[in-house]
């Protein structure tokens, strides 16, 4: 399962804005943040849709508690062991 989560994290991180969201939630806001807050704090493009985050919830990368998105425990464990997944250099 961790291999699948690691692979999904790596796939999601290929998108610059998704990588910014994941890094922000992992490193800066482990308590989570609402979608509108993420859009405002990270200056996401207006056409960035919340459905993309919902897909990561379905993939068990994020948790949504009704108001805020957070990194899921299993995804956090993968990132704790291998944080380079979120580094741009790793993705090249």
Locate each region found by the language model.
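Short, amphipathic alpha-helical interaction segments positioned at domain boundaries
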Residues: 75-92
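A short, conserved structural fragment
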Residues: 57-68
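Short amphipathic alpha-helical interaction segments
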Residues: 43-58
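Short alpha-helix boundary/capping elements
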Residues: 17, 29-30, 46, 60-61
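Short acidic, hydrophobic short linear motifs in intrinsically disordered regions
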Residues: 21, 31-41
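Minor-groove-contacting beta-hairpin "wing" of winged helix-turn-helix DNA-binding domains
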Residues: 67-76
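Short helix-capping/hinge SLiMs at alpha-helix to coil transitions
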Residues: 12, 26-31
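Short alpha-helical segments that sit at the start of domains
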Residues: 1-22
């Amino acid at each position: 399962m961790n291999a699948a989560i690691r692979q999904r994290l790596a796939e999601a991180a290929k998108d610059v804005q998704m990588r910014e969201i994941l890094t922000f939630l992992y490193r800066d806001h482990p308590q989570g943040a609402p979608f509108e807050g993420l859009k405002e704090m990270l200056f996401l493009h207006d056409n960035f849709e919340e459905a993309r985050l919902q897909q990561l919830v379905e993939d068990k990368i994020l948790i949504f508690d009704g108001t805020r998105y957070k990194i899921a425990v299993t995804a956090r464990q993968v990132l704790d062991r291998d944080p380079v997944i979120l580094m741009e250099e790793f993705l090249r």
